[in-house]
UniProtKB/Swiss-Prot annotation:
ATP binds at residues 74, 92, 105-109. Keywords: ATP-binding, DNA damage, DNA repair, DNA-binding, Magnesium, Nucleotide-binding, Nucleotidyltransferase, Transferase. Participates in a DNA-damage check-point that is active prior to asymmetric division when DNA is damaged. DisA forms globular foci that rapidly scan along the chromosomes during sporulation, searching for lesions. When a lesion is present, DisA pauses at the lesion site. This triggers a cellular response that culminates in a temporary block in sporulation initiation. Also has diadenylate cyclase activity, catalyzing the condensation of 2 ATP molecules into cyclic di-AMP (c-di-AMP). c-di-AMP acts as a signaling molecule that couples DNA integrity with progression of sporulation. The rise in c-di-AMP level generated by DisA while scanning the chromosome, operates as a positive signal that advances sporulation; upon encountering a lesion, the DisA focus arrests at the damaged site and halts c-di-AMP synthesis. It comes from the Bacteria. Homooctamer. This is DNA integrity scanning protein DisA. NCBIfam families: PRK13482.1. The keyword Cell membrane does not apply. GO terms for biological process: DNA repair. InterPro entries: DisA, DisA_sf, DNA_integrity_DisA_N_sf, DNA_integrity_scan_DisA_link, DNA_integrity_scan_DisA_N, DNA_integrity_scanning_protein, RuvA_2-like. It comes from Clostridioides difficile (strain 630) (Peptoclostridium difficile). Belongs to the DisA family. Its EC number is 2.7.7.85.
Length: 356
């Protein structure tokens, strides 16, 4: 399953036409006029090679100009930064041997031009009143804002449910880490719930881009719900990664799991470097302590790294005296006391079943 946000070409095109942008204002004007239109954004020289005839405009772009020029039958060619209208009423002559799945003349041309040049091509259907964006081999149909809002709100509700389940799993893991009772199952469960949250988040992030200026509220809700989940996911990998696989590589492997594979917790165990046999899921394992230590306010990453490297695991850090903590590079007596008190306070919060 390809993450929409990983497709940089379409992401760039989508941001360019998101609500609130000058280009989207012009496209909306054309939609309301029901004239249809074909707009090419000349991001490279290949575009100009297939432009024939028309009028050389070379004027500053404005939504009203786009609306007026779209009344003519030909294509409108804009500069790569959408600051200038280069040509109007132009004929586009792409290679007609390029395959296209479209039926209408305007959209067949748009798809061929996009495939041949890699440029962003926008087709506005006169009858269906729909905006379609093409870039390379990709195609995207722009949905109505109200529909996107409905989908975004539904996704936010789903995320709230997933996040509640994740928070319960993390709270449980916190208690187990402080009491040195963590098993592979506990870690795999948290990893699974985190990935489920991240997948819903990716969908909402796509909606936020589609909503443009209108998506501010959805974006704020998303950030509020997510909290430190993105950081915690990386730190859990650092805490329990048995084979010291690169974190980015590990995250990529988790992201590439399909829905059926994600349900099976043994797959998470395998990614961490454990056997993956269901009977070994109850095997006790120890955390390195990156995630818990990161919760101590204003404790630098370099100090956390020194602590983890000095002690074998988090339990040893937890049991260490102030004098033993003081021996770690970069930690003086004041900071050692601060770390010790911070860990004691967090352990008390965990016993009270509170989030840290």
């Amino acid at each position: 399953m390809e993450n929409f946000l990983d497709n940089k070409n379409m992401l760039y095109a989508l941001k360019m036409i998101s609500p609130g942008t000058p280009l989207r204002l012009g496209l909306n004007n054309v939609l309301r006029a029901k004239t249809g239109g074909l707009i090419v954004i000349a991001t490279n020289e290949d575009v100009m090679k297939i432009v024939d005839g028309g009028f050389a405009i070379n004027a500053e772009y404005s939504p009203s100009y786009l609306y007026e020029l779209a009344k003519m039958d030909g294509a409108i060619v804009l500069s790569g930064d959408v600051k200038k209208i280069l040509f109007a009423n132009a004929q586009l002559i792409p290679d007609y041997f390029i395959e296209t799945s479209e039926t209408g003349t305007r959209h067949r041309t748009a798809e061929r031009v996009a495939k041949q040049t890699g440029a962003i091509v926008i087709g506005i259907s006169q009858r269906r009143n729909v905006i379609t964006v093409y870039r390379g081999n990709e195609k995207y149909v722009v949905e109505d804002i109200s529909k996107i809002f409905t989908k975004a709100n539904q996704a936010i509700q789903t995320l709230e449910k997933y996040k509640t389940v994740l928070d319960q799993a993390v709270t449980n893991l916190n208690a187990l880490e402080f009491n040195d009772l963590v098993t592979i199952y506990d870690v795999a469960l948290v990893m699974q719930k985190m990935e489920m949250v991240m997948r819903v988040t990716s969908i909402i992030e796509k909606y936020v881009i589609e909503l443009g200026d209108e998506g501010t509220l959805v974006s704020m809700q998303l950030e509020e719900l997510m909290g430190t989940t993105r950081i915690d996911q990386k730190l859990i990998f650092k805490d329990y990664n048995k084979e010291n696989t690169e974190i980015k590589e590990l995250m990529k492997k988790v992201k590439n799991l399909n829905s059926e594979e994600l349900i099976e917790l043994v797959n998470m165990a395998k990614l961490l470097g454990y056997s993956g046999f269901s009977e070994s899921m109850d095997m006790p394992i120890k955390t390195r302590g990156y995630r818990i230590l990161s919760k101590i306010h204003r404790l630098p990453t370099a100090i956390i790294e020194n602590l983890v490297n000095y002690f074998e695991n988090f339990q040893q850090i937890l049991d260490a005296s102030i004098e033993e903590l003081d021996e770690v590079e970069g930690i003086g007596e004041i900071r050692a006391t601060y770390i010790k008190n911070g860990l004691i306070k967090m352990k008390q919060l965990v016993l009270l079943d509170r989030h840290i």
